[in-house]
């Protein structure tokens, strides 16, 4: 049924807009199993939401539309190929309405950077529409909708730090004491998640290829997070996809080396890359590392961030003006 079919639609859908902020993620630990028959890989990962936030505003409208500005926005589709668009359609379908909203996204999370920016925006649309339309869809149902959109979308709702299993969509909250401080190095280009997974499959199939040992258990990482000690966490950061990302973009080796040379405790490729995340001992150390890394000429740009932060949340409106 279309939202226009009933004469109560205008009463049911308030006018105005809702803005949601949503974080990017870093994978502190990413154990990638062999390719399954369905084409997916079994994952065990520790997600960590960091203070690099996209801002998504959803307004009532006559027709579904999407506009994007900011970090890498010009390279992104603004139609049904975009996960945020599909999130609007899915949410509307879930409640039996037409997806008549205008979505505006201000990007800060890098595009195709291994920080799940597209997934974050999709999660934000679900939260924004739930609020804008006053639906009261419970969190567990939002999580189920998020999992239909993609394996990183549920964590963008969840935020904080979480252990992800399955394809990454099954989440358990992880106790994290303390705030951890990060420097994020953005690469000039992006890496396709599908290509990185295909590359790790290819590398593993080469008999004469020596890869780093696969990750075995997230338990030491969870213990380090509970301790709140960045020095304990640093040597445990790991990513089974890192050899594939380095194979596809060899410049990342220089970036990783430069970050540690600048004073980071450790560096890791985030998810499928190419963003590199550097753990630092303090907020001040992160600023120093970021400054030095920015001048080293090994990445496009540098951001300082901290985590964990909460997942997709409505921004309180400073006024009632729509």
From Swiss-Prot:
SUPFAM superfamilies for the chain: GHMP Kinase, C-terminal domain (SSF55060), Ribosomal protein S5 domain 2-like (SSF54211)
Sites where the protein binds ATP: 110-120
One of the GO BP terms on file: isopentenyl diphosphate biosynthetic process, methylerythritol 4-phosphate pathway
Enzyme class: transferase
Entry keyword set: ATP-binding, Isoprene biosynthesis, Kinase, Nucleotide-binding, Transferase
Active-site residue numbers: 25, 152
GO molecular function, one term: ATP binding
Keyword Disulfide bond: no
Name this polypeptide is given: 4-diphosphocytidyl-2-C-methyl-D-erythritol kinase
Organism: Mycolicibacterium vanbaalenii (strain DSM 7251 / JCM 13017 / BCRC 16820 / KCTC 9966 / NRRL B-24157 / PYR-1) (Mycobacterium vanbaalenii)
Lineage, highest ranks first: Bacteria, Bacillati, Actinomycetota, Actinomycetes, Mycobacteriales
